[in-house]
Amino acid sequence: MRLHELHPAPGSRPRATRVGRGIGSGLGKTSGRGHKGQKARSGGGVRRGFEGGQMPLTRRLPKRGFTNIFARKLVPINVGELERFEPETVVTPELLHDAGLVKQARDGVKILGDGELTKKLTVKVQAASRKAIEKIEAAGGKVEVM
């Protein structure tokens, strides 16, 4: 079997309906577009969200909030993912990147508390949740927030 020999099973793909090919086809004359009107014309139809001239919903609702340009973009990592490291390891953002847990460090790494940790690790990161710190310290490790 070669790629050029592959074909769909007979009857699995319906034939393309050709419109505008005479009244016997069932889709002749107006080609399923009805009579006249904006939607019957070529390029016709209204844009997404258009409500016939009524003020659209997206413009009726108020704007809210803003984007804080100073927000730190921290990459979240769960405690359970640190289980792959050997005991007594010093876990840093660079080590997490080398291990493939973090693709791009951005403004740093934040350790979150999901999962279990049994190994004693020293974790040096930009931020950690209270639950994550408790789990790391319960396993005998320590957290240093840089």
From Swiss-Prot:
Alphabetized UniProt keyword annotations? Ribonucleoprotein, Ribosomal protein, RNA-binding, rRNA-binding
Please state the span of the N-terminal signal peptide per the UniProt entry.
Answer: none
* A GO CC term assigned to this protein in UniProt: cytosolic large ribosomal subunit
Record's compositionally biased regions (Gly residues):
21-31
Annotated region Disordered: the residues are: 1-58
Record's keyword annotation contains Coiled coil = no
Which GO-annotated molecular functions does the record name? rRNA binding; structural constituent of ribosome
SUPFAM superfamilies assigned to the protein according to its UniProt record, in alphabetical order = Ribosomal proteins L15p and L18e
What does the entry give for GO biological process?
translation
What the entry lists under PROSITE patterns is as follows: RIBOSOMAL_L15 (PS00475)
Q: How does it assemble?
A: Part of the 50S ribosomal subunit.
Function statement: Binds to the 23S rRNA.
Q: Which family does it belong to?
A: Belongs to the universal ribosomal protein uL15 family.
Protein name (record): Large ribosomal subunit protein uL15
Q: Which gene encodes it?
A: rplO
